[in-house]
Amino acid sequence: VQMKGITKVYPNGVAANQGVDFFLRRGEIHALMGENGAGKSTLMKMLFGLEQPTSGEIWVNGEKLSLTSPTVAISHGIGMVHQHFMLVPSLTVAENMVLGMAPRKGLFIDHAKAVAITKEYAEKYNLHVEPEAKVMDIPVGMKQKVEILKALVRGAKILILDEPTAVLTTQETVELFKELRNLKEQGYTIVFISHKLNEIMEITDRLTIMRG
């Protein structure tokens, strides 16, 4: 991934990013660090198609892209796990996993197939989840695993994690780091947005610092 000269100015004149260059190597865990308001999340929202740059270019795998929506970003193998999870609490883990791409039996989600897909991906990536549990009933660490699996099942090869340890216990953070190392070994590329230097030093290969 190459982001060249990225500028984002909102209609009210506030500049979130000005002339930012960001380079991401395949198969690395790359930290994006900076104080609140430095534009870290905004930059990654542009890579995920949630926002569009005012100017600048985004290249992925040698191709210049116009990432006009998350759907476009996902089609190019980019996934994002937000700080505030985007799961439907009243649905099961399996139903959340296939939401929007659900295997169907007539008008209804094919629940057995959704469970099978969830189990397959959970095993493949060593991310333990409970497919039949309602999201409202599972702990925060497992919700995060569901979000990661959701991105992977949609074909993400580049995974953006926005402040992923902010809501986790110490033990859940240890588990997350183990899972991220496992994904890296399988060739995935990870952006780790954080301001916790001790975590960055432990888990990441390279670091980009953004100043406000």
Model-derived segments and their meaning:
Residues 1-212:
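Glycine-rich phosphate-binding loops of nucleotide-dependent enzymes
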